[in-house]
Amino acid sequence: MVSTATQIAGFNFDNCLMNAAGVYCMSKEELLEIETSAAGSFVTKTGTLEAREGNPEPRYAPTPLGSINSMGLPNMGYDYYLDVVLDLEKEENSKNHFISVVGLSPEDTHTILKTLHSSAYQGLVELNLSCPNVPGKPQIAYDFETTEQLLTEIFSYYTKPLGVKLPPYFDIVHFDQAAAIFNKFPLAFVNSVNSIGNGLVIDDETVIIKPKNGFGGIGGDYIKPTALANVHAFYQRLNPSIQIIGTGGVKSGRDAFEHILCGASMVQIGTALQEEGPEIFTRITEELKQIMVEKGYQRLDDFRGKLHYLD
């Protein structure tokens, strides 16, 4: 029997597919749609210390090869999502989940994580080091010194399972430098990649989103080769204890298969989920299973990370 089950940091998931933070996860109602779908888990909207309205609309637009967005981290506040997940996990058949958070300052980050650490929540937390769409706030994970300092401070008190969501890296040296930092810490996972920041899409003579004069994060088909490269580069470099979540350009079973082949333990879906809705998890799961049957694979471990190279 072919299985797409997986695990991260000892947490079991019946399916390796889930949403990406930012898509179908703003409200309790949306999270419940993912919970009752074929997805193996959900991750909440990235929660900040206080609720945020985000950037002015229009701030998201589909494009022929994906999407562009400059959402600006709209969310209900991290405490809202903590309450939703704690209530949900009281249910007998609850799945395991991820809570996504970000601080708009180091102080905010520590306040959020210290609250999560002292809470009843025992599950996985995804710390976003990679949002490209908050005006005046750089992507932390591109500053290696700041990243190392922040993680050093966090792991001085945080002992629950924690992973980080990363921006795309494009230089081999940066893969080496980033991995060397991450390997110093007891991270449960890294999530590669967030959208490619500061793309520009034009319709006739006008940009198609309002914030930042049209600049926004690019997702969908555009970013799959970059996402696969990041997944595989970190799979080659990170300690085996640090697992990888692959995100970027997944709209078919073949796309999910390629992420796992590059080393991903779970696969998140963003743009395609936004366009197709939660039923996408059923379709992509069946497509992935069909590929596994055709290739004679029973479990994800049969091919995870086993990308072939040319002689």
Swiss-Prot record:
Primary localization class, coarse: cytoplasm
Cofactor note: Binds 1 FMN per subunit.
The protein's required cofactors: FMN
CDD domains: DHOD_1A_like
One of the record's GO cellular component terms: cytoplasm
Intracellular or extracellular location(s): Cytoplasm
UniProt keyword list: Cytoplasm, Flavoprotein, FMN, Oxidoreductase, Pyrimidine biosynthesis
Pfam family, one: DHO_dh
EC class name: oxidoreductase
GO molecular function, one term: dihydroorotate dehydrogenase (fumarate) activity
Protein purpose: Catalyzes the conversion of dihydroorotate to orotate with fumarate as the electron acceptor.
HAMAP family: DHO_dh_type1
Record protein name field: Putative dihydroorotate dehydrogenase A (fumarate)
Gene behind the chain: pyrD
